[in-house]
């Protein structure tokens, strides 16, 4: 699993002109699921995201986690995070998990993130064309990969 976590002051997902989900202060998570991903990847990322200290402590230091600032999560599935661009100019998404594998892991990720963090978890709609809006705070953007444990 690969994620892009962005610290936001607000974020929203709009589908077919209607706002589906929105949050205030928190993290927008773009989540890419690959064929080799398992429940272990879900657990590792959810634990890491919950404890990730990327929020300002008032002294210009990132010392606070999402619980300490009362933030929320907005999770959006994004298979393009597993694009391969080595050959040619058209990205290949061969490593991205097929929907029959990805959807259960996506739903598990949403559930476990809420359980582990105790925070509100909003989401986009798996497979839908979405307009994602955000105000990136900082900007702070973190890329994590569960296979590399970084």
Placement of each model-derived feature along the sequence:
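Compact, glycine-rich, soluble single-domain proteins
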Residues: 18-70, 80-111, 116
């Amino acid at each position: 699993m690969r994620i892009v976590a962005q610290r936001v002051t607000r974020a929203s997902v709009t589908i077919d002109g209607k706002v589906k989900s929105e949050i205030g202060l928190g993290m927008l998570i773009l989540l890419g699921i690959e064929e080799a991903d398992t429940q272990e990847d879900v657990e590792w990322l959810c634990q890491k995201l919950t404890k990730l200290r990327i929020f300002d402590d008032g002294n210009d230091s990132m010392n606070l986690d999402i619980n300490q600032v009362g933030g929320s999560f907005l999770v959006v599935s994004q298979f393009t995070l597993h694009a391969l661009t080595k050959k040619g100019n058209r990205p290949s998404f061969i490593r991205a998990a097929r929907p029959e594998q990805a959807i259960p892991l996506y739903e598990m990720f949403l559930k476990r993130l809420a359980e582990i963090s105790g925070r509100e978890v909003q989401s986009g709609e798996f497979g839908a064309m979405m307009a994602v809006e955000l105000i990136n705070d900082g900007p702070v953007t973190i890329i994590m990969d569960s296979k590399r444990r970084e």
